[in-house]
Protein backbone atom coordinates (compact mmCIF):
# COMPACT_ATOMS: atom_id res chain seq x y z
CA UNK A 1 0.00 0.00 0.00
CA UNK A 2 2.96 2.30 0.60
CA UNK A 3 4.05 2.06 -3.05
CA UNK A 4 0.53 2.90 -4.19
CA UNK A 5 0.15 5.86 -1.82
CA UNK A 6 3.47 7.46 -2.71
CA UNK A 7 3.17 6.89 -6.46
CA UNK A 8 -0.38 8.25 -6.43
CA UNK A 9 0.81 11.35 -4.59
CA UNK A 10 3.61 11.89 -7.11
CA UNK A 11 1.44 11.28 -10.17
CA UNK A 12 -1.85 13.00 -9.37
CA UNK A 13 -1.69 15.12 -6.24
CA UNK A 14 -4.96 16.95 -5.59
CA UNK A 15 -4.35 20.64 -6.20
CA UNK A 16 -7.43 22.50 -5.05
CA UNK A 17 -8.18 25.49 -2.86
CA UNK A 18 -9.94 23.23 -0.38
CA UNK A 19 -7.02 20.82 0.01
CA UNK A 20 -4.58 23.74 0.27
CA UNK A 21 -6.55 25.31 3.12
CA UNK A 22 -6.71 22.00 4.98
CA UNK A 23 -2.96 21.44 4.68
CA UNK A 24 -2.21 25.10 5.41
CA UNK A 25 -4.06 24.78 8.70
CA UNK A 26 -2.14 21.61 9.60
CA UNK A 27 1.26 23.18 8.88
CA UNK A 28 0.41 26.41 10.70
CA UNK A 29 -0.61 24.46 13.79
CA UNK A 30 2.62 22.47 13.58
CA UNK A 31 4.58 25.73 13.31
CA UNK A 32 2.87 27.10 16.42
CA UNK A 33 3.29 23.88 18.37
CA UNK A 34 6.94 23.27 17.51
CA UNK A 35 8.32 26.79 17.15
CA UNK A 36 6.16 29.28 19.05
CA UNK A 37 4.42 27.56 21.94
CA UNK A 38 7.24 25.68 23.65
CA UNK A 39 10.46 26.79 25.33
CA UNK A 40 13.44 27.09 22.97
CA UNK A 41 11.19 26.22 20.00
CA UNK A 42 12.42 29.15 17.92
CA UNK A 43 16.12 28.40 18.46
CA UNK A 44 16.58 27.17 14.89
CA UNK A 45 14.87 30.27 13.52
CA UNK A 46 17.29 32.46 15.46
CA UNK A 47 20.47 30.45 14.86
CA UNK A 48 20.18 29.78 11.13
CA UNK A 49 20.41 33.44 9.99
CA UNK A 50 23.54 33.82 12.10
CA UNK A 51 25.18 30.81 10.45
CA UNK A 52 24.06 31.38 6.85
CA UNK A 53 23.94 34.81 5.23
CA UNK A 54 23.55 33.82 1.56
CA UNK A 55 22.58 30.15 1.31
CA UNK A 56 18.88 29.12 1.64
CA UNK A 57 19.78 27.03 4.71
CA UNK A 58 19.12 30.26 6.60
CA UNK A 59 15.40 29.48 6.25
CA UNK A 60 13.85 26.59 8.23
CA UNK A 61 12.01 23.99 6.15
CA UNK A 62 8.70 24.71 7.87
CA UNK A 63 8.98 28.41 7.04
CA UNK A 64 10.68 31.47 8.44
CA UNK A 65 7.52 33.18 9.66
CA UNK A 66 3.95 32.06 10.18
CA UNK A 67 2.64 34.50 7.57
CA UNK A 68 4.81 32.83 4.91
CA UNK A 69 2.58 29.77 5.29
CA UNK A 70 -0.59 31.84 5.57
CA UNK A 71 0.17 33.71 2.33
CA UNK A 72 1.27 30.76 0.17
CA UNK A 73 -0.81 30.59 -3.00
CA UNK A 74 -2.08 27.53 -4.81
CA UNK A 75 0.03 28.45 -7.85
CA UNK A 76 3.20 28.65 -5.74
CA UNK A 77 2.53 25.23 -4.24
CA UNK A 78 1.82 23.70 -7.63
CA UNK A 79 4.92 25.27 -9.21
CA UNK A 80 7.10 23.94 -6.39
CA UNK A 81 5.64 20.46 -6.68
CA UNK A 82 6.24 20.17 -10.41
CA UNK A 83 9.74 21.61 -10.03
CA UNK A 84 10.98 18.94 -7.63
CA UNK A 85 8.57 16.01 -7.18
CA UNK A 86 9.46 13.59 -9.95
CA UNK A 87 10.65 9.97 -10.20
CA UNK A 88 13.97 11.20 -11.60
CA UNK A 89 14.44 13.37 -8.50
CA UNK A 90 13.41 10.89 -5.81
CA UNK A 91 15.03 8.39 -3.48
CA UNK A 92 12.92 5.38 -2.50
CA UNK A 93 13.64 3.70 0.84
CA UNK A 94 11.99 0.32 1.46
CA UNK A 95 12.13 -1.57 4.76
CA UNK A 96 10.45 -4.69 6.04
CA UNK A 97 10.09 -8.35 5.15
CA UNK A 98 10.75 -7.95 1.44
CA UNK A 99 13.49 -9.05 -0.95
CA UNK A 100 15.49 -6.70 -3.12
CA UNK A 101 14.01 -8.25 -6.26
CA UNK A 102 10.45 -7.76 -5.02
CA UNK A 103 11.17 -4.16 -4.06
CA UNK A 104 12.51 -3.45 -7.54
CA UNK A 105 9.48 -5.11 -9.14
CA UNK A 106 7.05 -3.04 -7.09
CA UNK A 107 9.00 0.17 -7.67
CA UNK A 108 8.91 -0.39 -11.43
CA UNK A 109 5.21 -1.27 -11.29
CA UNK A 110 4.11 1.81 -9.37
CA UNK A 111 6.69 4.43 -10.31
CA UNK A 112 7.78 3.25 -13.76
CA UNK A 113 4.72 4.68 -15.60
CA UNK A 114 5.16 8.13 -14.04
CA UNK A 115 6.80 10.36 -16.66
CA UNK A 116 10.11 12.05 -15.96
CA UNK A 117 9.99 15.78 -15.44
CA UNK A 118 12.40 18.42 -16.62
CA UNK A 119 14.03 19.58 -13.42
CA UNK A 120 15.05 23.17 -12.88
CA UNK A 121 18.76 23.53 -12.34
CA UNK A 122 19.44 24.77 -8.85
CA UNK A 123 21.97 27.59 -8.82
CA UNK A 124 22.33 28.24 -5.11
CA UNK A 125 24.57 31.04 -3.84
CA UNK A 126 27.80 29.99 -2.18
CA UNK A 127 28.09 30.80 1.50
CA UNK A 128 31.04 33.16 2.03
CA UNK A 129 33.74 32.32 4.54
CA UNK A 130 32.87 33.54 8.02
CA UNK A 131 35.66 35.78 9.33
CA UNK A 132 34.26 37.03 12.63
CA UNK A 133 32.07 35.95 15.51
CA UNK A 134 28.33 36.42 15.19
CA UNK A 135 26.38 36.62 18.41
CA UNK A 136 22.74 37.08 19.41
CA UNK A 137 21.35 37.43 22.93
CA UNK A 138 17.64 36.76 23.34
CA UNK A 139 15.44 37.09 26.42
CA UNK A 140 12.65 34.53 26.75
CA UNK A 141 10.37 33.18 29.48
CA UNK A 142 12.07 29.77 29.65
CA UNK A 143 12.98 27.42 32.53
CA UNK A 144 16.77 27.95 32.35
CA UNK A 145 19.29 29.88 30.29
CA UNK A 146 20.71 28.14 27.22
CA UNK A 147 23.79 28.61 25.09
CA UNK A 148 23.88 27.47 21.46
CA UNK A 149 27.09 27.54 19.44
CA UNK A 150 27.61 26.71 15.76
CA UNK A 151 30.93 26.05 14.04
CA UNK A 152 31.65 25.69 10.36
CA UNK A 153 32.43 22.16 9.23
CA UNK A 154 32.67 20.30 5.93
CA UNK A 155 29.67 19.18 3.90
CA UNK A 156 28.25 15.65 4.10
CA UNK A 157 30.07 14.48 0.94
CA UNK A 158 33.51 15.55 2.16
CA UNK A 159 35.81 12.64 3.15
CA UNK A 160 36.34 14.24 6.57
CA UNK A 161 32.63 14.39 7.43
CA UNK A 162 32.57 11.15 9.42
CA UNK A 163 35.67 12.20 11.36
CA UNK A 164 33.81 15.34 12.42
CA UNK A 165 30.80 13.23 13.34
CA UNK A 166 32.91 10.97 15.57
CA UNK A 167 34.69 13.99 17.06
CA UNK A 168 31.36 15.53 18.06
CA UNK A 169 30.46 12.30 19.88
CA UNK A 170 33.80 12.26 21.70
CA UNK A 171 33.32 15.86 22.77
CA UNK A 172 29.73 15.89 23.95
CA UNK A 173 27.69 12.74 23.37
CA UNK A 174 27.22 10.67 26.51
CA UNK A 175 28.22 10.93 30.17
CA UNK A 176 31.87 10.07 29.50
CA UNK A 177 32.33 12.70 26.76
CA UNK A 178 34.86 15.49 27.26
CA UNK A 179 32.47 18.44 27.54
CA UNK A 180 30.02 16.58 29.78
CA UNK A 181 32.85 15.62 32.12
CA UNK A 182 34.46 19.07 32.15
CA UNK A 183 31.48 21.46 32.02
CA UNK A 184 28.69 19.43 33.62
CA UNK A 185 30.39 17.19 36.21
CA UNK A 186 33.67 18.93 37.12
CA UNK A 187 32.86 22.64 36.84
CA UNK A 188 29.05 22.29 37.10
CA UNK A 189 28.32 25.34 34.93
CA UNK A 190 25.99 23.47 32.55
CA UNK A 191 23.31 20.85 33.13
CA UNK A 192 23.79 19.13 29.77
CA UNK A 193 25.63 19.28 26.45
CA UNK A 194 24.31 17.84 23.19
CA UNK A 195 26.02 17.67 19.77
CA UNK A 196 24.12 18.00 16.53
CA UNK A 197 26.43 17.68 13.51
CA UNK A 198 24.43 18.76 10.44
CA UNK A 199 23.96 16.42 7.48
CA UNK A 200 23.99 19.12 4.83
CA UNK A 201 25.11 19.60 1.27
CA UNK A 202 27.22 22.70 1.93
CA UNK A 203 29.64 23.60 4.76
Predicted segments, located by residue:
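Charge-rich, well-structured scaffold segments of protease-associated domains
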Residues: 1-119, 137, 155, 163, ...
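His/Glu-based metal-binding/catalytic segments typifying zinc-dependent metallopeptidases
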Residues: 32, 49, 119-176
Amino acid sequence: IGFWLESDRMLCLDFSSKSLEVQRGVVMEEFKQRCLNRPYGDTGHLLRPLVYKEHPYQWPTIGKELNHIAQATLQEVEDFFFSFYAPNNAILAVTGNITFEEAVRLAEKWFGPIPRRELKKRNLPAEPQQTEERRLTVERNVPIESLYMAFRMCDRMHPDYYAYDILSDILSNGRSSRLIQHLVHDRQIFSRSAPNPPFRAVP
